Amino acid sequence: MPVWGGGNKCGACGRTVYHAEEVQCDGRSFHRCCFLCMVCRKNLDSTTVAIHDEEIYCKSCYGKKYGPKGYGYGQGAGTLNMDRGERLGIKPESVQPHRPTTNPNTSKFAQKYGGAEKCSRCGDSVYAAEKIIGAGKPWHKNCFRCAKCGKSLESTTLTEKEGEIYCKGCYAKNFGPKGFGYGQGAGALVHAQ
């Protein structure tokens, strides 16, 4: 802990980690949102983390990268090599050259993944204390609202279309079925004599 207050520095992004969002591993501190596998970016915990040269991995990625290799050491069909079709004239995708970062943050993790995730609505950084996951994406608590009416949403009350989130009512009005027989209940029926 630093002498003059504040908190420990995150082992991934290098920023200050406060107690409410701290995860400790191998004598280092991490933000909960930074405690991710270096390869697949899955969230980690004390039962799924594996460490190699101060980098953190899930056990699956660690095994693939640093585990024993050779006949008899496969981990099921997921480790089989795939024919890429070169003999059929299919060209493999070109690999992009590595570009050095201009980010002053020297953390390998932050350089590789750009630090904090971005909010799907406003595009600003989302930190663990204010992050909500909805439709598989990060959102600020204040941005986690219906795109049409602005009503605050919960993960159980949202519907998603083309990357935007809506309350069930607005989704039904704007994207639901239309035409005869799709009124709003018995009040939409008209009886003519």
Curated annotation (Swiss-Prot):
Its main location: nucleus. Signal peptide: none annotated. There is a cross-link at K91 (Glycyl lysine isopeptide (Lys-Gly) (interchain with G-Cter in SUMO2)). Residues 10-61, 119-170 form the LIM zinc-binding domain. GO terms for cellular component: cytoplasm; focal adhesion; nucleus; Z disc. Highly expressed in the aorta, but not in heart and skeletal muscle. Keywords: Acetylation, Developmental protein, Differentiation, Isopeptide bond, LIM domain, Metal-binding, Nucleus, Repeat, Ubl conjugation, Zinc. It comes from the Eukaryota. It is found in: Nucleus. The modification N6-succinyllysine is found at K137. A motif (Nuclear localization signal) lies at residues 64-69. The keyword Repeat applies. The modification N6-acetyllysine is found at K112, K131, K137, K161. GO terms for biological process: cell differentiation; muscle tissue development; sarcomere organization. GO terms for molecular function: actinin binding; metal ion binding; structural constituent of muscle. PANTHER family: CYSTEINE AND GLYCINE-RICH PROTEIN 2 (PTHR24215:SF3), RHO-GTPASE-ACTIVATING PROTEIN LRG1 (PTHR24215). Interacts with KAT14. The LIM domain 1 is necessary and sufficient for this interaction. Interacts with GLRX3. Drastically down-regulated in response to PDGF-BB or cell injury, that promote smooth muscle cell proliferation and dedifferentiation. Seems to play a role in the development of the embryonic vascular system. This is Cysteine and glycine-rich protein 2. The gene is CSRP2.
